[in-house]
Regions:
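Active-site metal-binding loops of divalent metal-dependent hydrolases
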Residues: 56, 177-179, 201
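Short beta-strand-loop/turn "lid" adjacent to the catalytic site in phosphate-handling enzymes
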Residues: 1-11, 15
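Glycine-rich phosphate-binding/hydrolytic loop that grips phosphoryl groups
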Residues: 30-33, 199-227
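Short glycine-aspartate micro-motif
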Residues: 2, 48-52, 174
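A contiguous, well-structured pocket-lining segment that forms one wall/lid of small-molecule binding clefts
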Residues: 102-173, 179-197, 216-226
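Conserved phosphate-binding catalytic cores of ATP/NTP-utilizing and phosphoryl-transfer enzymes
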Residues: 24-49, 213-214
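Conserved phosphate-binding/catalytic loops in two-lobed NTP-binding clefts
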Residues: 23-24, 173, 190-211
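A short helix-loop
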Residues: 44-46, 51-54, 59-140, 219-227
């Protein structure tokens, strides 16, 4: 319903100003913002794998730029952002709690081996919430459990990417979405994967810049103009 309200407002504005209405999807905007942040105009029109990881998605997408998008992997239950936020709330922080979980995790210096559930490009994250609860019950510190949670997310994505790259060797992998702003996730993956691109939070948290790029491209104003 929130997206339909936006369509109605855009339609009314375009009619009142005699302007063309360019319809795009929410996910196209996020992918466009991610590709732009990762490599400017270079990845547009090329094949790549894109992770969109947030409180509402843990999707692995096979893209040919933002115009051709195929979902080739996802979670069978809980999304990564949900697992992180639920841990943060469990530790007493306000929702959304991802930033607090990241701060706690950064303070943990212990070596941790994550345990994950991945089959091919499909993951299950419901067990992660139970694992975090068990660790807290065993007396592990909030810092330890937060780091464990984020490393589980990172290892899950790494394994999904590895499975996808077996079928699509050599493709770059772009990681976008709020959860990907975690330095722990970024460091873990980049040390274990080549051609991994991470999107800065300012481009990942809102897809407005991606929508703007797509509209500019539609009217041939980008990448011909500086941005």
């Amino acid at each position: 319903p929130c997206f339909l309200a936006g369509v109605s407002a855009a339609t009314a504005f375009s009619l009142s100003r005699a302007l063309p209405l360019i319809e795009l999807t929410h996910q196209q905007g996020h992918i466009s913002a991610a590709l732009f942040a990762a490599s400017g105009a270079d990845l547009f029109g090329k094949e790549e794998l894109v992770f969109h990881v947030s409180g509402g998605t843990t999707d692995l997408l096979h893209c040919k730029g933002p115009d051709s998008i195929t979902c080739i992997g996802t979670s069978s239950d809980l999304y990564a952002g949900q697992a992180v936020d639920r841990l943060g709330v469990r530790l007493g922080y306000a929702f959304p709690a991802g930033i607090y979980v990241s701060q706690l995790a950064a303070a943990c210096t212990e070596n941790i081996k994550p345990k994950v559930s991945v089959r091919g490009t499909t993951c299950s994250l419901s067990g992660l919430q139970n694992q975090c609860e068990k660790l807290l019950a065993e007396g592990k510190s909030p810092e330890y459990v937060s780091k464990y949670c984020l490393l589980c997310v990172a290892e899950t994505l790494r394994r999904m990417a590895a499975a996808a790259l077996e079928r699509n060797p050599g493709l770059p992998v772009v990681f976008a979405g709020g959860v990907m702003s975690s330095e722990i996730v970024r460091d873990y993956i980049t040390k274990r994967m080549q051609y991994a691109y991470f999107v800065p939070g300012k481009f990942a948290s809102d897809n407005a810049i991606g929508v703007s790029i797509l509209v500019a491209r539609e009217i041939n104003a980008w990448p011909n103009t500086s941005m």
